């Protein structure tokens, strides 16, 4: 680990030299690339500097303890040494997490897909709740959310919503949300006060660039039709809705939120590209898992990952046995209280696999 840290520190010094070169300012694209790389490894270099400083203090205190004869002073040095060892261990664990393998998709934007599962109208209402939660979380992180497609129900719910989430670190944070989200609450239509359980599925796909996934236009079938609202009624007098079918994979994407056929097609292709990239990466992960004879990655996406219990104001994430009695705050967008421990957990898992 320490060889890697020395290498990172050396690279950091080289990047600082590059950034101080006035000629680099003439090439803004290269300057931004180097500045971004410099900012990414700066926390590692800072933590490594702290680690080395603590080690020097530990050696100094150990030498002073050997030389000291006064019992009270010796006890003070022992306490100082114990505290320094604790700080060194914490800093070393933090450095291990920082050096854990990084997901190559972490810097990408996101295609977020939320769909109602079991539970009928109640599940559709919870799709609306979850989308509102993610939208508020995005606002707190200054990300941009753009609805690509949605299908409303008659009482304000959503059968499905697909949105693009653009912003720094969007995939690195939201990737932990994919899976089945279960809700337990008394529906508005329930006269007996009984708690119902419904389920919603969340898919989080890294947005694919054209260089990531090439789509041959000959592999596409594009159909246009009139967009429809709740209940199936037509909401447009022109054929602006677009259905794109990728013939080799059988994937189908429908977009009808825009009044322009051209814009709907562009959005549909964005979603299709993300789904194809996700499919390719899932197949690759499955091959690796078969080779290792164990599941690799963040686990089966179809499993229940979280339960939202409204009567108890409780949210439980089953992957890390985390329970918080602040459901109202979480639904208000305070998702970092769940995502931070999830991120730490999966980083530690990735590091263990590397070792």
Swiss-Prot record:
Under the heading Pfam families, the entry gives: PCRF, RF-1
Residues recorded with modification N5-methylglutamine: 233
Q: How is it modified after translation?
A: Methylated by PrmC. Methylation increases the termination efficiency of RF1.
Q: Which UniProt keywords apply?
A: Cytoplasm, Methylation, Protein biosynthesis
GO terms, molecular function? translation release factor activity, codon specific
- Establish whether keyword Acetylation is in the entry: no
- Matching InterPro entries, A to Z? PCRF, Pep_chain_release_fac_I, Pep_chain_release_fac_I_sf, Prokaryotic/Mito_RF, RF-1
- Family statement: Belongs to the prokaryotic/mitochondrial release factor family.
In Swiss-Prot or TrEMBL terms, this protein is called: Peptide chain release factor 1
* Organism this protein belongs to: Syntrophobacter fumaroxidans (strain DSM 10017 / MPOB)
Which lineage? Bacteria, Pseudomonadati, Thermodesulfobacteriota, Syntrophobacteria, Syntrophobacterales
Q: Which gene encodes it?
A: prfA
